[in-house]
Amino acid sequence: RDGIEPWLERMSGVIKHLTRYADIICWQTTDLMKTGSQFIEPTGFHSIRLFADANYRPLWIRVWKMAGGAPGAGPLQLASTKPAPQFDTVLAFAGQEIEAYNDQEYSWVSAFASHAIQFVRRLTRDERRKWGYAGVWEIPAIRRDKDSEPQIPVELPWRCLKMHSDMNGMILDPFAGLGTAIIAAEQSGRVCRAIEADPLRCDLIVRRWEQFSDGKAEKVEA
C-alpha cells in the first residue's frame, strides 16, 4: 500500500517491542517516495515522533551519503520531481541515562554534551578521527545496477555496533533483510538475533553468513 499510514502502523508496533528490550536503538530510514501523491514522507521525522511516544529520545542524527557513482533516474523520478536516493538518515535513540562518559579523559565533553551516553571509549583514535565525530558518513552503497535500489553496506551497521555495544553483546535486528547486520555482528564479535518475514531472504541470509564465516548453519525446530 502507498502512503504513510501503513508505515506508521507497522513501525509503531516494531518500536513498541524494541523499546521494551533494547537500551539503545540505531535506526536507519529512507524517505518514503511512493505516497500516491506528489509529496514525499520524511520517515526520519516520523520515527522521532514514534520513539518519543515510547519515551525514547535521539542521541544523534547522521546522514549516510551513498558515495559512488551518480544514481540513475527511475520511473518515479521521470514522472515527478522526487529525487533519486543519494542519502539515508541514521538515528540513535535511548531512554534515560544508560552510560556515563569518563569525566577525566573527556572532561571537555561535559561542556557541550547534554546526555551521558559514551560511545567514544569503544572506538580507536583512528576510528574517532575518521568517522566517530562525523555528522555525514560517506559509505558506498551496494547496487546491482544503476537503476536498482541501493543496499545497505556492512560498514553502516558495523559502525553503529562499534559505538553502542561491547564484545559478545546481544544485537536485535527486526528487519534482517539480506543479513547485513548479522554479518556486521559476526565481524565485530557480537551476537545477533534477527527476524525476517520473507523465506527467500532467510535462505539468502543463511548462505551469506555461511560464505562469510565458513560455518554451517543449523536449523532449530521451534
Predicted regions and their residues:
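Core catalytic lobe of class I
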Residues: 1-202
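Alpha-helix capping/termination and helix-coil
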Residues: 165-168, 209, 213
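Short alpha-helix adjacent to the SAM-binding motif of class I
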Residues: 200-211
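Conserved phosphoryl-transfer catalytic core
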Residues: 210-222
